[in-house]
Amino acid sequence: MSSREFRYRGYTLEQLQTMTLDELANVMPSRIRRTLKRGLSIENKKLLDKIRKYKAMGIDKVIRTHRRDMPILPEMVGSKIAVHNGKEFVEITIVPEMIGHYLGEFAMTNRIVRHGKPGKGATRSSKFVPLK
């Protein structure tokens, strides 16, 4: 059984990687299209240049960034990026399925809270729950 070839809106990864940013903007969802048409910010351009430099030199090092608003582009596939979530850096390996999303979508800023059982040391409202 062969694995299915990745396609993004009808284009293969190789076709996407050969497109310019303007051509790519027409394929992307509206939110990212707007970001690309207006031009990437200076910080996002610096991050993209760093990713390109690391790929050209063959460096397989994790790139740390606070840029959660950076759209994931086809040329970023295969890179390892650590995105800051407000407390720590969350390491992400970019795969083709992530194209068309933002880096911040893969670094959650809040955790699911698991509350303890009521009783000793709990909140004031559960102070009077009988202990076993």
UniProtKB/Swiss-Prot annotation:
Keywords assigned by UniProt, alphabetized: Ribonucleoprotein, Ribosomal protein, RNA-binding, rRNA-binding
InterPro entries: Ribosomal_uS19, Ribosomal_uS19_CS, Ribosomal_uS19_euk/arc, Ribosomal_uS19_SF
Gene3D superfamilies recorded: 30s Ribosomal Protein S19, Chain A
GO terms of biological process kind: ribosomal small subunit assembly; translation
Gene Ontology cellular component list: cytosolic small ribosomal subunit
Keyword Manganese: no
Claim: Protein biosynthesis is one of the keywords in the record: no
GO function terms (MF aspect): rRNA binding; structural constituent of ribosome
Pfam families, per database record: Ribosomal_S19
Role of this protein: Protein S19 forms a complex with S13 that binds strongly to the 16S ribosomal RNA.
Family: Belongs to the universal ribosomal protein uS19 family.
Protein name listed in UniProt: Small ribosomal subunit protein uS19
